[in-house]
Amino acid sequence: MTQTSQRPLRVLAAMSGGVDSAVAAARAAEAGHDVTGVHLALSANPQSFRTGARGCCTIEDSRDARRAADVIGIPFYVWDLAERFREDVVEDFVAEYEAGRTPNPCLRCNEKIKFAALLDKALALGFDAVCTGHYATVVLAEDGSRELHRASDMAKDQSYVLGVLDEKQLAHAMFPLGDTLTTKDEIRAEAERRGLAVAKKPDSHDICFIADGDTQGFLANRLGGPAEGDILDESGTKLGTHEGAFGFTIGQRKGLKIGHPAPDGKPRYVLDISPVNNTVTVGPVEALDVTALTAIKPRWCGTPPSGPGTYTAQLRAHGGESEVTAELVDGTELNVTFTEPVRGVAPGQAVVLYDGTRVVGSATIATTVRRERVATGG
């Protein structure tokens, strides 16, 4: 059954300044909980964050959150977590790209900020739970444990970016939007009925701490400027140059400066990134097919699996599901084999395992196994 409370709780509502978190806070207050709103200041220089429609952590967003709290009728505070965010999210993002991996900063923010730094402070101040506008569901199992499940509306489900949470964190998590089969237009209509000015505010997208959306430029600035290197084909032949291998991700097609079309006339995609050699290897789309992967740093939403099992896996925040078999090795590595090959799997991404709608756990992809290709031509 869905997690319910027999008594009003002291709830700290994380309010980003967007419509989802505002409606979530309003629903929590309407349910009878003692709600306090908080906006997280995540940068010593808010101008470095995206502003307007595409932001989530700017001065403008803080003002929107405060206005929403005033309408709801709850106390509101701004908490400075800029240094923690810099260390745990921004620096991690830079280090992962420098190593040739593809991080997910939103997932890391949930793990290290919203349900660690924020939750720890909330519990220390006597709050019972942290409420957010995520679309996911916490379920109270028959044995009394908490389980994380997909949202009722799969189209809006955000359980992937919450797959790093453990049972202790889930016991203090509240997701008021996850249970309802409401469209985003209906959420906006509800916000408008409640008098919330953010009702028509567009959703945030992209990476909040890169103000202009230029990930390559951001990384070049942090890592000492562009360093020209070679773009190679699978045989090692030079096809072109790049301005820094650290800005690419597996499966990328755009931004490849290749001097001439491939012999087969087909587009080329990033297959491999070598920070040591500062090279990027490209190839045809079928070369991206992955049959298995090994993932590290597993985190479980409950008891770890005791042996091999069959699950569905999700590899990206908005990706589809894949049938897999998975086995935990020595408690530290997760070996995952796909029933059918999948494309564009990048080290650094999270693989999240599901048993039906229930999140089993997640781990960080370390290595992949590509499908063998049969040579053709004559």
From Swiss-Prot:
Keywords in UniProt for this one? ATP-binding, Cytoplasm, Disulfide bond, Nucleotide-binding, RNA-binding, Transferase, tRNA processing, tRNA-binding
Which Gene Ontology biological process is one annotated for this entry? tRNA wobble position uridine thiolation
Query: Which stretches of sequence are listed as region Interaction with tRNA?
Result: 156-158
Entry GO terms, CC: cytoplasm
One GO MF annotation is:
tRNA-uridine 2-sulfurtransferase activity
Q: Which CDD domains match?
A: MnmA_TRMU-like
Could you say which enzyme class this protein belongs to? transferase
- The residues annotated as the active site are 109 (nucleophile), 208 (cysteine persulfide intermediate)
- Reported function: Catalyzes the 2-thiolation of uridine at the wobble position (U34) of tRNA, leading to the formation of s(2)U34.
Q: Which HAMAP family match?
A: tRNA_thiouridyl_MnmA
Q: What is this protein called?
A: tRNA-specific 2-thiouridylase MnmA
**UniProt gene name:** mnmA
